[in-house]
């Protein structure tokens, strides 16, 4: 969201944040974090070579309309700077903030969609949904109004999988995870759906995640020991996002 509260204070953007020539397109922004999450979850500790393991198949982008009042509220600037004139239509600033892309990694099909609104919903913030389909189950991370905008992990069993066998394997897996995360538990929500329950007090916040990432980055800078898979996966990540931007621009012509 363009205008939101971070650490209890309104987030004020610089005016140039709305210029995609300076800030970059949305399809190459939040998408980088989503690609990291996908790689960590689906290809843990695997090296991804962008030249041989990645194929970007399709990408598109579209604009979020921002009024002058909204722009001024979020930047504390009273008027649109001249460099934004090319994005203004009927007195409304059109920011190419949204995008979707489809690609494959090691033959696995992946789709990402990012949508920017001006403000988050009431009592909500930046929201996230993830769906991973497997042969035995589908993993869903849901964060919506129904759940009070709290991220929850659900496992949906495939209909042709035996209930008793599935539950036994799921419980065994959870018990293995409990060695490291003893607070984890699984709840049967019926109709083949299971909730992996993580107590709120055990969840790290947004700022805490940034702290962990910063410490890891500074460690790599100081010790010059970034793992090879991390190096290659970083190249692959930015290959995907930059290729997606190029594809989306060509599609709009």
Regions found by a protein language model. Give the residues of each.
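C-terminal helical cap and adjacent loop that interface with cofactors, partners, or active-site loops
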Residues: 23-30, 34-51, 96-111, 118-253
